[in-house]
Amino acid sequence: INEDINEEWISDKTRYSCDGLKNQRIDSPYLKIENKFLKTSWEEAYKKITDKIKNTSSDKIAGLTGDLTNMETAFIVKEFFNKIIKSNYLDSRTENIYVNINDRKNYIFNASINGIEDTDLLILVGANPRYEATILNARIRKAYLKNKTKIFSFGDLGDLTYPYEVLSNSTSEINKFFQDKIDLSEKLKKSKKPIIIIGQSALKL
């Protein structure tokens, strides 16, 4: 239980995720031998990986974590590459979306999770919190119930469990917003505790 994050609640996606597991999912390591994947033990797999790393220059080794990788595993992979392999060739953007990681503000969520409840204006750009971050969506709903927070979205997201105003999701409309050329730009200036949530899909525009 973490009162600052989920307040002991879990989403339906979390509760029933076990029903979505496929019986043909990967449950053990496989080695590719003569163009065929053969089941093997973890010990044998680790031995093969170790041998490959020992006999390969660090500038020839790269790592890629997928969208379903949990934070702990991703961090361990990063530490392994930075401290053991001595390589920075590591990425997690499976869709090749550019994010400058040299500046922290490009990838951190500046507001705290529970701090969302205090916002008076929330803007969604390329983000659907109900399906992408259910805990976040629950906090946004609390913000609306608690403060009647004004919520805007570039694009219709369907039922988010709270009312919001839909704006055009065209790149020109989003560009006008950031150039202070639409009404929402003025609302942002007058807001005391605004939050803008930019989702990954916005980077594909």
Language-model-detected regions and their locations in the chain:
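Catalytic alpha/large subunits of respiratory electron-transfer oxidoreductases
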Residues: 1-205
